[in-house]
């Protein structure tokens, strides 16, 4: 019997030692130590053992109870379903420091007081990762080429700088060092100027025109007079300004080269129809309205397929937009149908003093059932400034042919006619006399040797040949009795409607219904 009591007492001592080891582990964890394996598990010193033995002296053999049944082999916790292990049923034990009760093990740090940190250690700020503060990550974007080339720190600015610009190249980097290295490597290989870093607030992403993008001046801040008036909290928003009133020769050459070099990559809102000397733009839905306006002013558009909200043509002349709206509401009586604008135009002509001649347009509006754009191919651009007059003559001849073909169409409705623009659509009824007179008046006004803003003998010669082929006569008072017209071999060369196109667009058009005559 005595041996059993000794064994039970020895077991109790071991349990107390185990509790002390657990208390040390909890204290080490509270002090920030995460390496439990480095904590040496050794027996208590003889002094602590004596304290334990002295504490056990208060227990009698009758107070010793057997260890409750465990839930599984190897587990150190008792069965939670047995009420005998609840803290209120266990007797207090005496440790070397204070009287501890089993309920202390349910408190934070098992009831062991944690020493306060000194003031010197409190001035050391915790790391961001330990304090839970999120590290903001900034990406950097290098726009290698284009009108807004540079290094950006904002994706919104980068997207605005590259959207709608054909052939632009850009890439994302994690650090400014990588972005700068990539930009310097590109500029060195291309032998161009070093790219600048453009912060978010300093990016100028909406130049007045595509052609002037490379030379757009930096944005000037408004200077406010503060004497007697309060400065507004923010600069007033500028009014919507689309383009300069006149297109320059540099603008035209920029758009001309853009059309010749466009291969269809990077922009699915347009494609080109390429001839031997010129490439014309075909704009689809969601095309950039500013580029549509500039190409219209340059006479370099063949077809426009606008969206239902007509956002692509919002910068075209107001009377042209109104004619399109009337066609949808009064002619076809449906604003949801897809339509097209087929344009035949001349190109501008310049002199040393500036712009001499603005393009003249004949525009056909109709309902487009199907558009199959062909693949755009990059063409060789060899045009020089001295070649612009020859190109203007060629487009002028094609314009005259398109205008004369209206005489063969018996069912036409004139939507709008102005000094240099005629807008018409097909009709299911015969052309009324009012529309016929409008077409004839427009033809008499523009079909002359002064079509391009100056007397051109080549244009006179072309008109003479075309009219005589139809059985008519033509004389020009600028030419000596109509016989001193320059017999230019280049004007006689080529097929009936200019150079043969290298590819064409396939489209099916529906004939719109009739409507009453619209008064402009």
Swiss-Prot record:
> What SUPFAM superfamilies has UniProt attached to this entry?
L9 N-domain-like
Which Gene3D superfamilies has this protein been placed in? Ribonuclease H1, N-terminal domain
The record's region (Disordered) falls at 487-520
Subcellular localization, as worded in the UniProt entry = Host cytoplasm
> Is the keyword Transit peptide in the record?
no
What top-level branch of life does the organism fall under? Viruses
What else the UniProt entry mentions is: The inclusion bodies are the site of viral DNA synthesis, virion assembly and accumulation in the infected cell.
Q: What is this protein called?
A: Transactivator/viroplasmin protein
What organism does the record attribute this protein to?
A: Cauliflower mosaic virus (strain CM-1841) (CaMV)
Taxonomy, top ranks, is: Viruses, Riboviria, Pararnavirae, Artverviricota, Revtraviricetes
